[in-house]
A protein has these predicted regions:
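Short basic/hydrophobic patches in alpha-helices and adjacent helix-turn junctions
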Residues: 88-92, 104, 113-120, 138-142
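Hydrophobic cores of alpha-helical transmembrane segments in multi-pass inner/ER membrane proteins
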Residues: 29, 61, 136-143
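Functional transmembrane core segments of multi-pass inner-membrane proteins
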Residues: 10-11, 18-110, 150-158
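Membrane-embedded alpha-helical bundles of polytopic integral membrane proteins
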Residues: 1-16
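Residue-level detector of functionally special positions within alpha-helical transmembrane segments
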Residues: 15, 109, 129-131
């Protein structure tokens, strides 16, 4: 996953600077993810393909839905292209990790947007790069997604 980390750090910085996620890097996440997950499957004998695909769908549906419903104004196509790759990787770990990662990214992005509005650095309609928040949520999902998901489900008796 070192290759994925290098790509994601690059995308994070580029999106902050230019408010876009370039296709050559975004699309590269797919073969990197698939190869990395295949290596993991071969090494462990664990092939949670259904969970990985569900993770990809969990990430794609809300982000793609916002892009479609807003005519591309509420979310960039780079975010739409990146999301399923991130969800695929987190879904391989577990659906809970995919959900935690996505929700974390949304929450952090929302809090930052509100703070920017409160301090006058943004207003309604201001373009705020969302890729860094997706990548941050992905990192949270990778590191603590399973633990946070289990704790949340346990708190509600599931």
């Amino acid at each position: 996953m070192l290759c994925a980390s290098v790509i994601l750090i690059s995308l994070f910085v580029i999106d902050l600077d230019h408010k876009r996620l370039p296709d050559p890097l975004t699309v590269l996440m797919y073969p990197v993810a698939v190869i990395g997950l295949a290596i993991n499957g071969l090494a462990t004998g664990n092939w949670p393909i259904g969970s990985a695909l569900l993770g990809a769908a969990i990430w794609l549906l809300p982000i793609g839905g916002i892009w479609v419903l807003s005519g591309g104004r509420g979310m960039g196509m780079g975010d739409v292209k990146l999301a399923p790759a991130l969800g695929l990787i987190l879904g391989w770990i577990g659906v809970g990790s995919a959900v935690v990662g996505l929700v974390s990214g949304w929450l952090i992005g929302g809090v930052v947007a509100i703070v920017l509005m409160l301090v006058g650095r943004a207003r309604s309609g201001t373009a705020i790069p969302f890729g860094p928040f997706l990548i941050g949520g992905f990192a949270i999902g990778m590191v603590a997604g399973a633990v946070l998901s289990d704790a949340y489900m346990g708190a509600f008796g599931f």
